[in-house]
Amino acid sequence: MISCGRVHAPPEFIEQVSKYPNLGDMRQVRPSIRAFEMAIRNIESGTERPRGVLEPQPQKFWDEMMNDTACIIPKRSPPDSLSVDVTRESIKSTLHELCDHFMRNIKTTSIDPRADGAFGLAINMLTLAMEVSVSPSNNFASGRIILRTIVENYITLKYLAKKDDDTIWMQYRNYGSGQTALAFLKNTFAEETPDSIDMERLEILANEDAWLETKDIAVGNWAKLDLRKMAIDAEVKDVYDAYYDWTSGFVHGHWGAVRDSSFTVCMNPLHRLHRVPAPGNPMPAVLTDCCKLCNRSLDEIGQLFPSFKPRIDWKSDGAKA
């Protein structure tokens, strides 16, 4: 409106507006701009519009720009090209050593919830890290889902190790066994069973510790705590805060994660930075974070079942690059 001569203002004010926020004292310039905008708001909204001045049509303008100009799709960034060969071999050898350490620590052929639980969680974490290292998931949304699983495994192991109580170890095992029985019973009476479920295998697992008919099936968290409180009790709230919230979005389909993995922004300024589909957006690699948490789980194994020294070498690949 100033440039069209419809509103007059002192030259110094015009210069401050045109060079905002790089000129003048902002404690004075900002209030002046706000007051000026409020003074002309009625003209723009129509309550005091001069005769012959057309009503603004912002939506029609943006609609025309969308219909008459093409989207500009940004070039997709390539995924990290950093080799993970050394890390992969280190995970493989460490996993092998971990399994050997388990065999050396078998004390009974009866149920041992402490050894099975601790080693099982750690072995599961390293197995998931291995899957990341041999697949494209390292740079995609599925890798974040795996990382989230590793985070929960680690917090659970740390909580169990800190308490180190036979009753709590058994509580963890019984809850998981009951959930297996529940899954079997639900699918037994279902009209259609998912192709990914092997009912014969599921039945064996459901009856492994005891007949499923004799098992208690609990609901909720096995420790009667949510994961955040479990992390606080285990003194690993730093892990929860750093990893859990964002990675959980990919598991639950939260908008932020969906937006990050499925869309990009149109670079045409006349399109107001709207979203356009871009499935398979490459993302920062997750393998290093997976390995860090795996090594922290191995620290717990070393304390529960001394001594265990092997660790995953995740730094050598980065050093080569």
Question: What role is predicted for each listed range?
Answer:
Residues 157-160, 300:
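Active-site catalytic microenvironments for nucleophilic, acid-base chemistry
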Residues 92-157:
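Long, hydrophobic/aromatic-enriched structural stretches that serve as scaffold segments
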Residues 1-107, 173-321:
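Secondary-shell segments that build the walls of catalytic and ion/ligand-binding clefts
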